[in-house]
Amino acid sequence: GLGDVYKRQPNFIPAWNHQAKLAVAGKEWLDCNARGVSKWTGLSFLMNYFGLTPDEVCCFGDNLNDIEMLQNAGESYAVSNARAEVIASAKHTCPPYWENGVLQVLKTFLKETTNPF
């Protein structure tokens, strides 16, 4: 079943959301970031540093704290056991972690690309 944090989020996220960006990140975890900071803003910083565009980025996610990143990256995968709203945010799905889903996708990329980096 869903963890306690997910069940209780309606009680505390509205009270704190004006000060920080809160997102359920697992059964018992809650990400608390400064407003305007997310996995996507971190990835955007790295893209800028390396001169990459969103179309040159692939990301993987499994929880609510990944949605913005999944929506904006050129290629995005949600693991198949993620929540429905996370899967809807990604362009693709991959098998769950216990089936090495991320590794399966990365192996496919590496086989298809002569210079992946």
Segments the model singles out, each with a brief description of its role:
Residues 72, 80-117:
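Asp-based, Mg2+/Mn2+-dependent phosphohydrolase catalytic module
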Residues 3-60, 64-69, 81:
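Conserved acidic, metal-coordinating active-site core of Asp-based
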Residues 1, 59, 76, 99:
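Short glycine/serine/threonine-biased micro-segments
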